[in-house]
A protein has these predicted regions:
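Conserved nucleotide-binding/hydrolysis modules and their immediate coupling elements
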Residues: 516-522, 526-554, 562
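Catalytic P-loop NTP-binding/switch module of NTPases
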Residues: 552, 558-604
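Conserved bacterial/organellar gene-expression machines centered on ribosome-associated P-loop NTPases
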Residues: 398-404, 409-419, 590-604, 608, ...
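Catalytic cores of soluble metabolic enzymes centered on carboxylation/carboxyl-transfer
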Residues: 259, 298-531, 622-625, 659-661, ...
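N-terminal beta-alpha lobe that positions the nucleotide/phosphoryl donor
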Residues: 1-274, 278-297
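Structured functional modules or segments
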Residues: 593-667
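Short amphipathic alpha-helical segments
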Residues: 166, 243, 389-395, 597-599
């Protein structure tokens, strides 16, 4: 059996591998860059080796440095995780040459499936359904436009060595094909060191459904069911689930059989994933094969009861699979939400900074027979760096059925506290309660269709306003009673805490009276409605759980001056709790207007300016590219919002900018 595993990765996947290895009695070695000296995976491993500067090109994907770490520690096996070197055939070959076990598939399979053009040809020969397209390399932008026109728009422009949403663009016309070709080429070169591009037909309104395969070195290959990965943004998965709410048993069987056939065609062993796009008639087409463990593997583990990392280790050690295809059953439903360091209110742009607060919900069994799991690689006080992928954690919920899993996830998101960075928790909550998502009627266009103007938060309806008003009154009442008991203010004076309040949210006012009702508290509203409440706010707490109207409510609470900031279910409001008299006077107060930035192009994310496309005095049209910013390994194009004249260019290529720093100024 393997005795020591070096994990050629970082963050949550490194911690994930360490957890299984520890349970199996196998020692682990972490590697780390300058940016990760204090990282969780470094502390969790039995040993840790420094491998270089923060940029991944000089550390996590520097094969010679990984090999040096292997020699230094005497590791007899390497788990590559996902990303970085996980699908690098040269790395796997170097390990073979060094006599080190690669916990993954054979080199030949990595080569065959790692090239998107070759993989599609092999898939077609293996009888796997494929999408029409141009499988030869594209020379330049003009050829990209010509071929796209021949295939028929829309088309998907993709990096041959791509993955993770990088190096991919959808084009609907010749202009977008030319621009998309160059952007895909640049991203592919930066992310994978390989800028080869191909083009295929884009299937409109598709679902993204993938099949998990697992094979051993003795010729057995099985499939472990599917994962629904259609909730995507910019081709990057955000929410996954297993099984899919769309597949019927016949389609599931057919997809599984084709995935196994493809794996056998390349003599595959270890865990791998065959991705398909599926149209509304359940026709499915091969997309790509990922020759590694997927980010979203936990949902498969939760519904099958298997530990995929353990299976990978056992297969790498030469063991045969201990179960057959008929032994694989899907029990219940699992949902995964990816917590990203990104600002949903700024079009999901990357965010960096220190985690001043990181309190995930408790893992394990919950009420109603459900289960929570949180895979993470960070701790409170840790830093989210601009050098790596912005994923902070993967929160997973299992339930006996789909809605039970979704509701468990929704409550867990309510309880998840993250401060110090921008993050997508509010957006995840919004999706979980969206009726279209809950019904299972989803495609890869879900986010674009349901949030066409980006995410601006969830607007409270009348019922939500009542719940938030009740929370605000409960919090305010505790603070008032606490203040009333402070000694030494005025001698022989008994302060009476009022019971009648007016709660203001922006332009909405709600009259509320708080009353004791046995062991519960009753909030009566001015319109005659009422809510019973249970639960206590502890002064200084940033989160509180109540039962309001019979339903559990977990709210994040911040006291900011005279306001109580409440965040719940994607809503973010400031509540002002005042006496009726003060509320009447407050209506006459003037409101401060935000500064005018309409004549500035501000950097929407921390990153590096890679190109400036205009100069001072130039007239630009709406939608015209002005500059590009590279952040988190992604290239982002900044465009003109309207017709304008450039007054001043404030930066030059190579400049590192923080959020909201000026890029251009307009007349």
């Amino acid at each position: 059996m393997i005795k020591k595993i070096l994990i050629a990765n970082r963050g949550e996947i490194a911690c994930r591998v360490i957890r299984t290895a520890r349970r199996m009695g196998i020692r682990t070695v972490a590697v780390f860059s300058d940016a990760d000296r204090e990282a969780l995976h470094v502390r969790e491993a039995d040993e840790a080796v420094h491998i270089g500067p923060a940029p991944s090109s000089q550390s996590y994907i520097a094969i010679d440095r990984i090999l040096d770490a292997i020699r230094t520690t005497g590791a007899d096996a390497v788990h590559p995780g996902y990303g970085f070197l996980s699908e690098n055939a040269a790395f796997a070959a170097a390990l073979d040459a060094a006599g080190v076990i690669f916990i993954g598939p054979p080199v030949g399979a990595i080569k065959a499936m790692g090239d998107k053009i070759t993989s599609k040809k092999i898939a077609a020969e293996a009888g796997v359904s494929t999408v029409p397209g141009h499988m030869d390399l594209i020379a330049d932008a003009d050829e990209a436009a010509r071929i796209s026109g021949e295939i028929g728009y829309p088309v998907m422009i993709k990096a041959s060595a791509g993955g993770g949403g990088k190096g991919m663009r959808i084009a609907w016309n010749d202009a977008e094909a030319r621009e998309g070709f160059q952007s895909s080429k640049n991203e592919a070169k930066a992310s994978f060191g390989d800028d080869r591009i191909f083009i295929e037909k884009f299937v409109t309104q598709p679902r993204h459904i993938e099949i998990q395969v697992l094979g051993d070195r003795h010729g057995t290959v099985l499939h472990l069911g599917e994962r629904e990965c259609s909730i995507q943004r910019r081709n990057q998965k955000v929410i996954e689930e297993a099984p899919s709410p769309f597949l019927d048993p016949e389609t599931r069987r057919a997809m599984g059989e084709q995935a196994v056939a493809l794996a056998k065609a390349v003599n595959y062993h270890s865990a791998g994933t065959v991705e398909f796009i599926v149209d509304g008639a359940r026709n499915f087409y091969f997309l790509e094969m990922n020759t590694r463990l997927q980010v979203e593997h936990p949902v498969t583990e939760l519904v099958t009861g298997l530990d995929l990392v353990e299976q990978m280790i056992r297969v790498a050690a030469g063991e045969a699979l201990s179960f057959a295809q008929d032994d694989v059953t899907l029990d219940g439903w699992a949902v995964e939400s990816r917590l990203y360091a990104e600002d949903p209110y700024r079009n999901f742009l990357p965010s960096i900074g220190r985690l001043t607060r990181y309190r995930p919900p408790a893992e394990g069994p919950t009420g109603g027979g459900c289960v929570l799991r949180n895979d993470t690689g960070v701790t409170e006080g840790g830093e989210i760096s601009m050098y790596y992928d912005p994923m902070v954690a993967k929160l997973c919920a299992w339930g006996p059925d789909r809605l039970a899993a979704i509701d468990t996830m929704l409550h867990a998101l309510d309880d998840f506290e993250v401060e110090g960075i921008g993050h997508n928790l509010p957006f995840l909550s919004a999706v979980m309660q969206h009726e279209r998502f809950r019904s299972g009627n989803i495609t890869t266009a879900f986010i674009a269709e349901e949030f066409p103007d980006g995410f601006q938060g969830v607007e409270p309806d009348a019922d939500a306003h009542r719940v938030l008003a009740a929370v605000a009154v409960l919090v305010h009442q505790v603070l008032q009673e606490r203040a009333a008991h402070i000694s030494g203010i005025v001698g022989h004076h008994r302060r009476v805490v009022a019971k009648d309040w007016v709660v203001r949210f922006d332009d909405t006012e709600i009259e509320a009276t708080i009353e004791a009702l046995g062991e519960e508290t009753c909030i009566r509203f001015g319109d005659g409605g009422m809510l019973t409440t249970a639960g206590v706010f502890v002064p200084g707490a940033t989160h509180a759980r109540f039962v309001i109207g019979g339903e559990p409510v977990g709210v994040k609470i911040d006291l900011t001056g005279s306001a109580i900031r409440l965040r719940w279910r994607g809503m973010d409001v400031k509540a002002y709790v005042r006496s009726p008299r003060v509320a009447a006077l407050a209506r006459w107060m003037l409101r401060k207007l935000p500064p005018d930035t309409s004549k500035l192009l501000l950097c929407p994310m921390p990153g590096v300016i890679t190109a400036i496309m205009v100069s001072a005095g130039e007239t630009v049209e709406a939608g015209q590219p002005l500059a590009t910013v590279e952040a988190m390994k992604m290239e982002n194009i900044l465009r003109a919002e309207r017709r304008s004249v450039v007054k001043r260019v404030a930066v030059e290529p190579g400049t590192s900018l923080a959020v909201d720093e000026v890029v251009l100024e307009f007349e």
